[in-house]
Amino acid sequence: MYQIRIEFTFDSGHRLLDYNGKCAYPHGHTYRAEVFIESQSLNELGLVYDFTDLKDRIKTWVDENWDHAFLLNSRDSELIEGLSGAKLVRLH
């Protein structure tokens, strides 16, 4: 088994629904994420996947969707209504 791993960080805000404490209010974190790609064999170049291409594609997607975004729970109707018109990312 062959494997490559990409690790990166991004900053986002969120809040916890149905929580009795200060985390019920909007706040932010620096998140650390890891992506693993596995293969039983290597390609014709001797790679699982082009590491640079994969890293760039994942980082671009994260930057466009999660970095410096406010991540909303789909049940958070109060905040969703308050932010209507803004670009929203909903989590389930």
Region locations from a protein language model:
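Charge-rich, low-complexity N-terminal segments
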Residues: 1-92
